[in-house]
Amino acid sequence: MTEIAGKLFTWINTRLPIVNTFERHLSKHPVPSKVNFWYLFGALAAVTLIIQIVTGIWLIMPYSNTEEQAFSSIEYIMRDVDYGWMIRYMHTTGASLFFAVVYLHMFRGLLYGSYQKPKELVWIFGCTIYLAMMAEGFLGYVLPYGQMSYWGAQVIISLFGAIPYIGESLELWVRGDYYISGITVSRFFALHVVALPLVLIALVFLHLVALHEVGAGNPEGVDIEEHLDEDGVPLDSVPFFPYKVLNALVAIGVFMTVFSIIMFFFPEGGGYFIEMANFQEANPLVTPDHIAPVWYYAPFYTMLRAIPDPLGGLIVMAAAVAIFFIVPWLDRSKVASIRYKGIFSKIAITMFGVSFLTLGYLGTVGVTEVRKTMSVICTIIYFAYFLLMPIYTKYETTKEVPERL
């Protein structure tokens, strides 16, 4: 029996390079021997993506993508489908934690220069993944057809109307009707469960292929490829499997514990994961007292509200996301890691982080004059971090980077 299995494996391996692929990307793929916890969020993002895909498949089975039955089918899932409540809460909790770990993953990239040469494509693919996530999250947000889903979608889609000349036609084309209706739900459903997941999977594949081609970074910003042994393997590296895989499994265990606690005991997340208004069916005749996006869109929604002109707000909001794509060419520093950059880089990234968190908070609360002023200030700080980067990274005094880890 063992001999037959061995021959079968050999037959398959000569036609499908299983061993070579495993060795190249796992058992013999060199990764830096010294990294910190910031480098675990990529693995956690992959775990949450898998959770979203699996739970999403189960949710679409009993879900009905019609205006009349969308909300009631969610209630049916929650009340009558075996473990339907758990699958739904896994999906909603997973959505929020997916964005949380991706935000931390992106922040790590800014901290340690994970966009510098030759990692530009790795960064660009990552930013495109984030853009696809935003679209995927918005489309899924509309599907429960609750009050906040309806009015939130109404506000966001109406932004297209601010574009000169083509705005009204584009708004109608996106919505598919003159108001949020079953047509909108149906087309958003198709995009959410088929089109964008395929795009996400393809982008993640390209992101990983590009990463494995140029090699992973490290907190020191040291290029481990500069010091090789007689076999051409970096001296300051270990095989990805089993060392980093086992390390990631510990982090995944802790993450899933936190995930489970939230899912079972705080599934609504205090109204941040699932808004209380979304437990009511959409009513086009009744506007909620306060229309706010899900927390992971809140910083950009705050920027939108900070600009009085609708078109100006739309441009600022779009630019806030798009500017990440050009970071590799904005940073003129000779060192990658924040550990060895100058004081201006450290102050700038601290102010950027504080402004982003403040914008996130302001996007979840009502508008007052003080909050509007804070929104404008934080928006300016947000963009200043990027736009002034070519100046402060070029002229600041940096520390000497060690030759090896």
Q: Positions of the model-derived regions?
A:
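Membrane-embedded and interfacial regions of multi-pass energy-transducing membrane proteins
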Residues: 2-97, 101-405
